[in-house]
Amino acid sequence: MTLATPPATNPKPSWPVFETPLLGRETVADRTMSFHFAKPVGWSYRAGQFVDITLLDPPETDAEGNLRGFSISSAPREDVITITTRLRDTAFKRVLQAVPLGTLVKMEGPFGDLRLHHAARPAVLLAGGIGITPFRSILVETIGGGALRYPVVLFHANRRPEDAAFADEFRSLGHRDPNLTFVPTMTAMPGSGYAWDGERGHIDAAMLRRHVDGLVDPIYYIAGPPGMVQALRTMLIASGVDEDDVRIEEFTGY
């Protein structure tokens, strides 16, 4: 007697999987929007982590599919789960902007291990564009819980002030905690309608030296597009920073 082979089953994931409703949308910069979702009772995450979001039965889709990974831009102490993204012209982004509030999505996670170190060394955070999102979560959570334990310098590169998400919030956090220094820099000011008297150009060693005492002393965290992340990592190591003191988080074009 031949026994039939049972159909293969997908093993149950070892991380949380749940459905949660979209509660709100908020424009936080030009072509950049935050999406707020309900946070389930008992679900938790660490500042700096990310989740996978799947659209359920969307009205349209494309070759990129219905699943994306997003850093969580909200802090664990906040009441909602927030993700923040550039509004590229994809089916996923169009659906997320258009569906009624209350629409359910599937969320999986949290994942990732981007977190500030515990040692009493200064930190330098280098963000490009939407790569700022995990740093917003980390800084709001840490400063909201008391204060930073060591100096932190946050560099955020954008094309124009119009593109810089959370800039006013970072300035406010810097006034609240003297250990935080915020250094925004703009790379395409001729295309802006704003006046600007801050840093200009891409983040480089010369810019770092203007704001960081002892280039090899801090631990560095880099988040942004892969090309920027790798260029900054190469620059830091060439400047004498130990490669073990460089932590990276790459953001692809989701």
What residue ranges belong to the model's regions?
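Short, conserved phosphate/pyrophosphate- and ester-handling motifs at nucleotide-, phospho-/glycolipid
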Residues: 48, 131, 225
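A short, basic/flexible loop-to-alpha-helix module at the beginning of a structural domain
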Residues: 108-119
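Histidine-anchored nucleotide/phosphate-binding helix
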Residues: 132-144
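Conserved S-adenosyl-L-methionine
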Residues: 144-150
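Conserved beta-strand elements of the Class I
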Residues: 124-126, 221
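Reductase modules of NAD(P)H-dependent flavoproteins
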Residues: 3-7, 12-18, 92, 152-254
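Ferredoxin-reductase
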Residues: 3-103, 158-160, 187-188
